[in-house]
Amino acid sequence: MKIAIDAMGGDKAPSAIIEGAVHAAREFGSNIILVGKREVISSELKKHDVKNLPLSIRHASEIIEMHESPSVALRKKRDSSIKVGIELVKRGEADAFVSAGNTGAVMAASTLILRTLKGIDRPAIAVQLPTTSGPVILIDAGANVDCKPHQLFQFGIMGHVFAKYVIGRDNPRVGILNNGEEEDKGNEITKEVHKVLKKSTLNFIGNVEGKELYKGAADVVVSDGFVGNITLKVSESLADMIGKALKGIFTKNWRSKLGYLLIKPYLESFKKSVDYSEYGGAPLLGVNGICIIAHGSSSPKAIKNAIRQAGEFVKGRVNIHIQEDIERNIKIQPSEVKKGGVLRALKEIVSFSGKKETGKEATTEDTEVSESIK
């Protein structure tokens, strides 16, 4: 198995990325292709003992920075580490791609180069949120701001496959993130998706309220990317606030410090359960290849686990199972599937990233990127 990793992407690149890759190669035995500027990567590798480790370098002369517009950068930087890495997957020279770089660029390049799986209209980001009974998958966490019923239906199938074949849930419970448990709650789109999922082969449990998300009420929670991303960001902010509050409490005086020492093992266990670095990254599901999007500020540990996760997706044959489940449910799938899905998906990515070249219509820009990236 070969995993390509964007050595130049992320706030802590290249040092944290390469250190994480070295740990992954040593611990998992994965063949890792470090994509980026050869001289920079070689210099970083000298800081580690890499003798006999399955590491190789694929040169890419350009870097897409975190602040750049995905569409503009992909059009102008044709030898970027993101584009080169994804092309390795396209050509079968790598089984998966991992990047902590510009999320919008990774999504756009994956969609345009790898294309979507048969039966999938839009790719979606799936994140794992911690609960008292193990992680729950939230899909979509930001790839698609506006969604149609058939797209949310497809997200449910992709989340089901993730939960079953990667996390190991025997019969994953799938729910819709909604403002009430009752079947008639929600907007017109969620009501329509509810009807279709109810008829599907999935273990559909109905609507899931926000208050039930962290109680483990479902294994997979379906949402559009707008609501999903807000949910994710609120969760991250809340976790940060709780951490700071606890730190303030336990450093207040000698009694609180003593109390901390008594419960430290339990706090460490809790911290580990909510630490994103333990999960590694978030898969971009629905594209014809395995792509893991890591957090921009990923530590070496997070990168190591993102590489591990990429391997799990390859071994789990996730894309094959997604297509099989789409085929099983094709007769009940909402019929509103239109042509031009790739360009519409790119338009969503540009909108989501908030970085767009001025003076051009979105459709013109999308077409230019689609043609130039090939």
Each language-model region and where it sits:
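Short, glycine-rich nucleotide/cofactor-binding loops
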Residues: I3-S15, A143-F153, I293-P300
